[in-house]
Swiss-Prot record:
It comes from Escherichia coli (strain K12). The gene is mdtD. This is Putative multidrug resistance protein MdtD. The keyword Cell inner membrane applies. It is a multi-pass membrane protein. Residues 1-11, 70-76, 125-137, 186-196, 246-262, 307-341, 417-430 are periplasmic. NCBIfam families: efflux_EmrB, PRK10504.1. It comes from the Bacteria.
Length: 471
């Protein structure tokens, strides 16, 4: 990339900045949840909604981000994304109640939903095609550093300052990024087709109310009738979308995607798989602090081996999949992650704390292998004319399943414990034990889906290439 103009390199730095902000925010909050609960006078069992409100908003807004960038311009949308994310951070820091914090996190989520996909689109437009992979590697590297720094930095700020600072640090970074975007980034636009607003609203309503109904089933004060009504509204909205998308060439996501078997299996497996693994980043720091009495900083440091294991495994995951095939790798990593989850719970409850970093490192390796395999399985056989739509749907499902996973984790804690779980409670470790056992079972269930994946990987790739070349 040394032969790129200086202006283009600066634009890549801006995109990388945005990737870093978004990835840091996804991990820095987890370590601070117990301190937030104490400061806001809430039960720790309710704090999962701080994560859910952000991730669910990202899932809802993702389908609109690419269309908005093409219609209004990548600079205008990227600038708007940074401003919304920064304002959301400010309002998070100023929040005095849990409801205020949830609204502020939703505003952050709107910005976060546009930042990464619009950043990818910007890179596609400003660099030559032959340098696109090198440019994407450059801008996504800070996004890999964010999860590494997030837990420890969050714990450090909480322990030696206050939880408000995990949001306040975004403000100067956001201001610099917004100004640089206005000054340096070109405002590319493209001719767009009409946006599928009806489909977007149906999907948004369906995802939001079903998640709310799931969360409302324990300890929120919603009546059974209200919850049943929410479920009915959500199901009707999703069924209406299916009817809307049938034979509709302008649908947000074409139903033709599901004619590709590996896409259908991969998407179903990704949804179920990320529900289970989405619980882990929320539950692990909460368990370390509330269940075992770790300090926020110590709990944050304990998360670093998991990220290192994930980053290290990315270097060899392709060779592993090529050697053993998708079916074997996905079934083995799914069951393996369930066993590692049980191992983490056992070693922690036995007090073998010196073993935990190694267990978390192993967890990161297994999880990374499964994530990469699920992503490539889902998209690898799609024809070229459906690849972009399939990738967008996969991104939305990834965020949605993570929000559902965190919601279920909070639901399990509320089911097995009281509304006042604390370090001083004699039953706290028992509550967490039952929760971890349930999580291990949920994590293992997608193995039944992955067992149906065709095993001849190389043949599938060849078939896929012949299909694409024939179109």
């Amino acid at each position: 990339m040394t032969d790129l103009p200086d202006s283009t390199r600066w634009q890549l730095w801006i995109v990388a900045f945005g990737f870093f902000m978004q990835s840091l925010d996804t991990t820095i909050v987890n370590t601070a949840l117990p301190s937030m609960a104490q400061s806001l006078g809430e039960s720790p069992l309710h704090m999962h909604m701080v994560i859910v409100s952000y991730v669910l908003t990202v899932a809802v807004m993702l389908p609109a981000s690419g269309w908005l960038a093409d219609k209004v311009g990548v600079r205008n949308i990227f600038f708007t994304a940074i401003v919304l994310f920064t304002l959301g951070s400010l309002f998070c820091a100023l929040s005095g109640t849990l409801n205020e914090l949830l609204l502020a996190r939703a505003l952050q989520g709107v910005g976060g939903a546009m930042m990464v996909p619009v950043g990818r689109l910007t890179v596609m437009k400003i660099v030559p095609r032959e340098q696109y992979m090198a440019a994407m590697t450059f801008v996504t590297l800070p996004g890999q550093v964010g999860p590494l720094l997030g837990p420890a930095l969050g714990g450090l700020l909480v322990e030696y300052a206050s939880w408000h600072w995990i949001f306040l640090i975004n403000i100067p970074v956001g201001i610099i990024g917004a100004i640089a975007t206005l000054l340096l980034m070109p405002n590319y636009t493209m001719q767009t087709r009409r946006f599928d607003l009806s489909g977007f609203l149906l999907l948004a309503v369906g995802m939001a109310v079903l998640t709310l109904a799931l969360d409302g089933s324990k300890g929120t004060g919603l009546s059974p009738l209200t919850i049943a009504g929410l479920v009915a509204v959500g199901v009707v909205a999703l069924v209406l979308y299916l009817l809307h998308a049938r034979n509709n060439n302008r649908a947000l996501f074409s139903l033709k995607l599901f004619r590709t078997r590996t896409f259908s299996l991969g998407l179903a497996g990704s949804f179920a798989g990320r529900i289970g693994s989405g619980m882990l980043p929320f539950m692990t720091p909460v368990f370390l602090q509330i269940g075992l009495g770790f300090s926020p900083f110590h709990a944050g440091l304990m998360m670093i081996p998991m990220v290192l294991g994930s980053m290290g495994m990315k270097r060899i995951v392709v060779q592993v999949v090529n050697r053993f095939g998708y079916r074997r790798v996905l079934v083995a990593t799914t069951l393996g992650l369930s066993l590692v989850t049980l191992l983490f719970m056992t070693t922690a409850l036995l007090g073998w704390y010196y073993v935990l970093p190694f267990v978390l490192f192993l967890q990161g390796m297994v999880n990374s292998t499964r994530f990469s395999s699920m992503n490539t399985l889902t998209l690898k056989d799609l024809p070229d004319n459906l690849a972009s739509s399939g990738n967008s749907l996969l991104s939305m499902i990834m965020q949605l399943s993570m929000s559902i996973g965190v919601t279920i984790a909070g639901l399990l804690l509320g089911l097995f414990g009281s509304q006042h779980v604390s370090v001083d409670s004699g039953t706290t470790q028992t509550v967490f034990m039952y929760t971890w056992l349930s999580m291990a079972l949920i994590i293992a269930l997608p193995a039944f889906i992955f067992a149906r994946v065709p095993n001849d990987t190389h043949q599938n790739v060849a078939i896929s290439r012949r299909k694409r070349s024939a179109q």
